[in-house]
Structures are given as C-alpha cells and as structure tokens.
Amino acid sequence: AYEIRPSLVGSEMCIRDRADAVTPAVLAYEGIQYQYLAPGIFSDTQWDYVNRHLNILSGFYGVLCPSDAVIPYRLEMQTKLETENATDLYHFWNNQLYQALYCKFEKDSPKELINLASAEYSKAVLPYLTEDVHCVTCVFGEFVQGKVKVKATLAKMARGEMVRWMAEHQIQTAEDLKQFTGLGFEFEESLSSGTEYVFLKKDICPED
C-alpha cells in the first residue's frame, strides 16, 4: 500500500483541468471579429487555408496559428504589465512578433503581409517592418464630412468577414482583396494607396 500526498493530487487535478480547457486558438476567442469569421462552420478547405495563411496576435502567447492549442485568458496588448526587463507588453515583445511572422515567409518568394489587426495589435508589428515585406493595412469605414470615419464595432465585423471570405475564395494576393464586398463594403480606389486599402459602406461614398 502507498499514500499519495494531497499536494500531488491537487497538481494532477490542476493539470487535467487545464488539459480539458485547451482549445484551438481560432475557436477560443469570442470577440466580434471571430463571430463574423465563424470558424465553427468552416469547410475542410477553409480550415486548411487559415492554418496556412492566418496568424493571430496575442499579448500572452505571441503569434498563434489557428489550430494552436491555448487556454482561455484575459490579457490585452495595452495592459500595463511591468516585468524585470519591460514596462509594458509592447516593450516585452519588442520585435519578436514581427520576427515570428517573418519566419513564416517562404525563402526567395514575394513577401506580402495583410494587416487586419486592430490598431492596438498593429503597433506591436508595423514599427518593425523590413523593406522586403509589402504590408497592406485594410481600413473599413464610412465617408462622413469629407473624412473616413471608422466605427470600432463595424470594423471588427468587417475584419472577421474578410478573413472568412478570403478562406472561402482562397485569396492569394493583396490585389485580390479589392474584390471584397462583404457587409456592404466596397474598395475605394481614390482613398487607398499601395499600403492601405480603404473599404467604404457602398451607400456612403465620397462626393465627386
């Protein structure tokens, strides 16, 4: 006969509880953009596409693939979190998120990055862009009084919708994004540039 120490039992139960809580990253998040991404109804082809092309930025984990196992957590990139060597998460991660993304590019192939992250997370990547990477940031808004006005909720919906659309149509280049018309948005050439694609609600367009 032998006796198991209570501390070991507690540790094992904790490990099992955490194992039960693990879920693929793209299914673990419940924000508006993920609701419109709707990964729960993906086809096998769509799953394959996002696993090859989609990267999720996390203040806790860093750069995640959609199928990476995670335990649900609450930690936003803007959270003040001082460590021994950093004053916040931007300082903590420094250029590591960009380097992780850069390593995913195939050697000697064109390097194109589609930025559908919020401004909060974009700040952790865009300052470190290298000259050999063409990055396009997508902006979703309405044209109000001569300016593009971005509404946070609508933009989140559109970002998720665009990723789902990209997976459905197997989009391969930034140029192909101009065909996106989800949620009533249309690409607006006159307000866009080579590094920023502006999509406006089609019933609210710039004056001629």
Model-predicted regions and their roles:
Residues 39-193, 198-208:
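Internal, well-folded beta-alpha domain core
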